[in-house]
């Protein structure tokens, strides 16, 4: 991935690394950057433009249905709902919005007590506006709580709207889905994550290298929250963003090591490939960490297309076995053996 350099913030490859800049967090508490730079308006949200434009229509017209926003973590689901509530309610936001995290408040008592009591409260709002109940991680709610919520949504439909954020909409019962407009968010692209990172870097005056930004984007995998947390953690710990510092903070198998291991497999050199695997294993990385990074590196590895297909098929098969609980070093070594076998010259009989 190409990363554009920006003024004095970046460092040319080959230049001497500057001495670490002491973090601004020293000596006093600083707000996490995830909260500090959380968008407050819908047009500030990065990515998922089509879905956000639908929310902007809701905000303009004021007639909001119950909504479910489903998508991966760190894509802006909860932030979008809060921006919508702010656009609709303005100064009344504090009194007219109840925000609950359903992964904590997941039982039927929450629906019967907190949600029902809030829905019954009288709040003075502009004409055509409704109170909003935000349920984050709604797919963690028990079936009993969801059944109780269905009836509550019907009874208080004249005064209250429900906004649910979840990772998987299929874990929300059908009766609730049928009462809501379902909006889907996708993972953010590398370019979208990079644009927001550069915005924060410029405001916080963070020194960085291109490979450091690539490392943050690689570890984030389309999760903006993860990217900003990794950026702040690396800056707080080292005062300088480069790939070495990022992987010290994130502590996952280094993609350069994984890339070298895949190259040995392409060269059918099982001994050297196994040495790298054993090294990663002895560092304490789990099979899930290793197999996940093997897949992510393999996707962009320069090799023949037919070979890449064969490699990914074997990686997927091994990932399935690891997920089933067969997560020994022998299982991972078997993957390397099968990958090497794909590129070995046939033995003459």
From Swiss-Prot:
Record carries keyword Nucleus: yes
Cellular component terms, GO, for this chain's entry? Ctf18 RFC-like complex; DNA replication factor C complex; nucleus
InterPro entries in the cross-refs: AAA+_ATPase (IPR003593), ATPase_AAA_core (IPR003959), DNA_pol3_clamp-load_cplx_C (IPR008921), DNA_Rep/Repair_Clamp_Loader (IPR050238), P-loop_NTPase (IPR027417), Rep_factorC_C (IPR013748), RFC_lid (IPR047854)
Would you say which domain of life the source belongs to? Eukaryota
Give positions of region: Disordered.
Answer: 1-27
Pfam families linked to this entry: AAA, Rep_fac_C
**Could you tell me where this protein is found in the cell?**
Nucleus
Annotated positions binding ATP: 71-78
> For the modification N6-acetyllysine, which residues carry it?
158, 299
Q: What is its quaternary makeup?
A: Subunit of the RFC complex, an heteropentameric complex consisting of a large subunit RFC1 and four small subunits RFC2, RFC3, RFC4 and RFC5; the RFC complex interacts with PCNA. Forms an heterotetrameric complex with RFC3, RFC4 and RFC5; this complex has ATPase activity but is not stimulated by PCNA. The heterotetramer of subunits RFC2, RFC3, RFC4 and RFC5 interacts with RAD17. RFC2 also interacts with PRKAR1A; the complex may be involved in cell survival. Interacts with DDX11.
State what protein this is by name: Replication factor C subunit 2
């Amino acid at each position: 991935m190409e990363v554009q350099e920006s003024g004095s913030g970046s460092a040319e490859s080959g230049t001497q690394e500057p001495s670490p800049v002491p973090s601004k967090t020293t000596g006093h508490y600083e707000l996490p950057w995830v909260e500090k730079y959380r968008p407050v308006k819908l047009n500030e949200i990065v990515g998922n433009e089509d879905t956000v434009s639908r929310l902007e229509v809701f905000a303009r017209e004021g007639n909001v249905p119950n909504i479910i926003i489903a998508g991966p973590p760190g894509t802006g689901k909860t932030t979008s709902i809060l921006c919508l509530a702010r656009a609709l309610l303005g100064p009344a936001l504090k009194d007219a919005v109840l925000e609950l995290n359903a992964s904590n408040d997941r039982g039927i008592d929450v629906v019967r007590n907190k949600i029902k009591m809030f829905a019954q409260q009288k709040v003075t709002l502009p004409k055509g506006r409704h109170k909003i109940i935000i349920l984050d991680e709604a797919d963690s709610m028990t079936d009993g709580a969801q059944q109780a919520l269905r009836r509550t949504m019907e009874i208080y439909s004249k005064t209250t709207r429900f906004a649910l954020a979840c990772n998987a909409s299929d874990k929300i019962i059908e009766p609730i889905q049928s009462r809501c407009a379902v909006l889907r968010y996708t993972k953010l692209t590398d370019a979208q994550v990079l644009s927001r990172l550069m915005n924060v870097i410029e405001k916080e005056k963070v020194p960085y290298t291109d490979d450091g930004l690539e490392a943050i984007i690689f570890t984030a995998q389309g999760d903006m929250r993860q990217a900003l947390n990794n950026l702040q953690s690396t800056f707080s710990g080292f005062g300088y963003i480069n790939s070495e510092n990022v992987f010290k903070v994130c502590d996952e198998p280094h993609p350069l090591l994984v890339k070298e291991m895949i190259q040995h497999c392409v060269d059918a050199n099982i001994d050297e490939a196994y040495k790298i695997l054993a090294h990663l294993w002895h560092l304490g990385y789990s099979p899930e960490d290793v197999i996940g990074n093997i897949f992510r590196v393999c996707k962009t590895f320069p090799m023949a297309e037919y070979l890449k297909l064969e490699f990914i098929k074997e990686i997927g098969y091994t990932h399935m076995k690891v997920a089933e609980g067969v997560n020994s070093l022998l299982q991972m070594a078997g993957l390397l053996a099968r990958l090497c076998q794909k590129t070995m010259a046939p033995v003459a009989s």
